[in-house]
């Protein structure tokens, strides 16, 4: 079985994708879309997502933050995003 290409997404990557008014939103969204279409697997951590959600709460609407959370969780359940749990 062929291994999927993986890229680690940090806070700023997720923020650029989720924050539509951000300077890099279009560029980050295009990269993410092309990466997914090519069969790539985004990898991130629970700590990264916590930081991203905290920043989104201060920069976007509650609905925008909720949409991001729901999207990430759905992608994780569908094996389209891998979330690593950080332990010490």
Question: For the regions a protein language model found, what residue spans apply to each?
Answer:
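Short glycine-enriched loop/turn motifs at secondary-structure junctions
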Residues: 35-37, 75-78
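Short, conserved alpha-helical segments within structured domains
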Residues: 44-48, 86-87
